[in-house]
Amino acid sequence: MTKLEICCYSVDCAQIAEKAGADRIELCCGQSEGGLTPSIGALMQARETVTIPVHPIVRPRGGDFCYSDNDFAIIKNDIARIRDMGFAGVVVGVLDIDGHIDMRRMREIMSVSGSLAVTFHRAFDMCQNPMIALQQLADLNVARILTSGQQQNAELGLALLKDLVAATQGQGPIIMAGAGVRLTNMQKFIDAGIRELHSSAGRTVPSTMKYRKAGVTMCADSDVDEFAHYCVDGEVVEAMKSLLVMGAPLPQSA
């Protein structure tokens, strides 16, 4: 059966996703950056309160995936901490200046990771040649690849996703479709033979604050609503899981 991983930007979201039936959590912070390494406090709380597998992302900054020596040292230190805390896996990815998998650094990462299941994240979508990258990641014994098929969303990348699944032939990394995977389009990925789906399944949640200071923001983008935040929608996760488990019909509306 196809597995459902939910991207969570807080422990609250992870708890909602678990209760709704998610198979696994990718734990992040920094939604506006596309996902950054969660804090030590978030990692500790997740270990204490979430029972399904949690795979924290290790990404020290936003932007590209070609890292300085300091960035890379931070990545290895964070992975070692995640390993020692007993997490099931980790999500990471490193490229070189030419848009290829940085094999030297990835070998170091695999060594530090130990028994952690390593997901190579959407840095894969920034690679020059996805088929060469697939073989390199297979050689590294990476557990899975999170990818949109090198497109802005996974539905647009469905052709490459199918090619990647065919190339693995049930061997090597699991191909996990992510970016724009929703209840209304997930059947397309299931029909393509994709074994794992990654979704944020989220909604905007209004702040509980009654007093709201006007004219002051904590973000450089003054248009951002700071009295709202993004969180997992448990009902959506339940519906997605229901489709996977029972083959429930898709809703007619988008």
Curated annotation (Swiss-Prot):
Molecular function in Gene Ontology: copper ion binding
One GO location term (cellular component): cytoplasm
Instruction: Fetch the Gene3D superfamilies from UniProt.
Output: Copper homeostasis (CutC) domain (3.20.20.380)
Question: Would you say which domain of life the source belongs to?
Answer: Bacteria
The UniProt keyword set, sorted, is: Cytoplasm
Q: Is Electron transport among this UniProt entry's keywords?
A: no
Disulfide-bonded cysteine pairs: these are none
Matching InterPro entries: CutC-like, CutC-like_dom_sf
Q: Where in the cell is it found?
A: Cytoplasm
What family classification does the UniProt entry report for this protein?
Belongs to the CutC family.
Q: Which NCBIfam families match?
A: PRK11572.1 (NF008603)
PANTHER family from the UniProt entry = COPPER HOMEOSTASIS PROTEIN CUTC (PTHR12598), COPPER HOMEOSTASIS PROTEIN CUTC HOMOLOG (PTHR12598:SF0)
Q: What HAMAP family does the record tag this protein with?
A: CutC (MF_00795)
Q: What is this protein called?
A: PF03932 family protein CutC
Which gene specifies this protein's sequence? cutC
